[in-house]
Structure formats: C-alpha cells, structure tokens
Amino acid sequence: MLKDGIGFDRVIVCCGRVDLRYGIDGLSSYVRLHYSLNPIEKGTLFLFCGTRADRIKGIIYEGDGTTLITKRLSKGNRFQWPRTPDEAKELSKEQYRLLMNGFAIEGTIREFHAEKHEKAPGTDTGILEKSS
C-alpha cells in the first residue's frame, strides 16, 4: 500500500521532525494545530518522520475511521525527508514514489565558490600539469 501509492488520493508530507510516539489522536492534533489542515479529509495521507529518518508514520481517514500506518526501513537505510520545520507539502504521485524509493524530493542548491574552480595559469582546462 505505502510503496505503491494505492488507497489514497493526496499525500501531505509534514516536514521537519515529529515525535513518532504520537498515535492517531496526537498526529491528528499535530496536523490541526501546526498546519491548520483537516486530518479527517477522506483519502488524504499525512506522513510524518522522526529524528532518525529510518521510519515514518502516516494517518489516513477512510470515511469510517482513521488508519495509522508505520514503516521502518531496513538497517542502514534512511528516508530523504524534507527538514524545513513548520511546513506541510503536497506531493505529486511521482514525488511520493521517489520518496518511498529513497530519493530526495527537494533539490539542494549549493553556493558556488569560484576559487575552487579557477583555471591554472597558462592552461585552458583548469587542470594543473605536473612539471618534469
């Protein structure tokens, strides 16, 4: 169910770290209080990740009740979880699939440092040649 994306219409990732000791009531309250979203919106999966990033929890309201889902990855594996606190993001089916398969869903922009990429004097390639 989780890896295939079957059984729900929308996926909302609750970014940052959440105490995974919470159950259905605690996670539902978290969604209401931190994101002002409705945790009993039918067909919407809310996902949460803890500090270790090797496990996630999800809640989904199915019309007649709420289901609590837990997934723990094998030793050495981690979810690439967005860590921006106080933010909830809706994922496309493709982003969800990438997340469940261990890929990051957010790109990282790194600062460019020109001094690390300067060309060596007298060369076009930027590669220092060994003198004989």
Please state what every model-predicted region is.
Residues 1-132:
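Polybasic/polar functional segments that serve as interface/processing modules
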